[in-house]
Amino acid sequence: MTFKSGFVAILGRPNVGKSTFLNHVMGQKIAIMSDKAQTTRNKIMGIYTTDKEQIVFIDTPGIHKPKTALGDFMVEAAYSTLREVDTVLFMVPADEPRGKGDDMIIERLKAAKVPVILVVNKIDKVHPDQLLAQIDDFRQQMDFKEIVPISALQGNNVSRLVDILSENLEEGFQYFPEDQITDHPERFLVSEMIREKVLMLTREEIPHSVAVVIDSMKRDEETDKVHIRATIMVERDSQKGIIIGKGGSMLKKIGSMARRDIELMLGDKVFLETWVKVKKNWRDKKLDLADFGYNKKEY
């Protein structure tokens, strides 16, 4: 039997549902999610393998007009995938009109010479007439290989989209073992799960100012628990106070919620210790960006 494989990038503006889609396809959490824009900062692979095929999805940071060095890193990480994939899924929301951000991405896609499938997400939020108008508007902007409306949250049409990708795969190698679901190490996934809880529980400027560093992660032979020490980095003392909360209540809540997700992922009991440190303006310092896991050399 012929084995087929290929690489598929998921591109789009922030908050259009790229990570929700990837997690639904994979059947488990690979990429963190929140209602905050620019939640995804790194490229994250989701490796979907059957006995006949392997589709390597690359979830990318939302493309936006960058205002910091971190923003530059995120946008470059997204666009760099155009050089390394066989197909692009360009995801747009059904419930928002086409904007300047979409037009900017479309111009880059036209120049990339890669087959592009338009994925219109969040169809559960709109009337069919609005959906048809949205599809017609985007259809006039460029020549898409396919146009597929979906609801990543509810799963509508997601399997159909995967089938379309499968039909267009070419004969190729199995790049990853069948039990590997992502390219990122466990430490990265743990740091992202902690950051997700910070995003979920805080507001205003804090989400964009947070990075999480895993200081150590090892099994304690006496308790048979995975002992994790993590530092939450922020840019200002006021942000540190908010994350710690009154009497440490917010930090305790972040740790408790993150620990449950980490235990599900690792399949082990976890002892999680968290600290909060201030590193002023880290998002604009390239050395700090690399220390916190945002290194262009890896992309």
Swiss-Prot record:
Q: Which residue intervals define the domain Era-type G in the entry?
A: 4-171
GO BP terms:
ribosomal small subunit assembly
Q: Where in the cell is it found?
A: Cytoplasm; Cell membrane
An example of a Gene Ontology cellular component annotation for this protein is:
cytosol
- G2: annotated segments: 38-42
Residue ranges, annotated region (G3): 59-62
Keywords on this record?
Cell membrane, Cytoplasm, GTP-binding, Membrane, Nucleotide-binding, Ribosome biogenesis, RNA-binding, rRNA-binding
> Pfam families in the record, alphabetically?
KH_2 (PF07650), MMR_HSR1 (PF01926)
> What superkingdom heads the lineage?
Bacteria
Membrane topology of the entry: Peripheral membrane protein
> Residues in domain KH type-2?
202-280
InterPro entries, sorted? G_ERA_dom, GTP-bd, GTPase_Era-like, KH_dom-like_a/b, KH_dom_type_2, KH_sf_prok-type, P-loop_NTPase, Small_GTP-bd
Annotated region G1: the residues are 12-19
List residues binding GTP: 12-19, 59-63, 121-124
Task: Please give the PANTHER family that the UniProt record associates with this protein.
Answer: GTPASE ERA, GTPASE ERA, MITOCHONDRIAL
**Protein family per UniProt:** Belongs to the TRAFAC class TrmE-Era-EngA-EngB-Septin-like GTPase superfamily. Era GTPase family.
Q: Which protein are we looking at?
A: GTPase Era
UniProt source species: Streptococcus gordonii (strain Challis / ATCC 35105 / BCRC 15272 / CH1 / DL1 / V288)
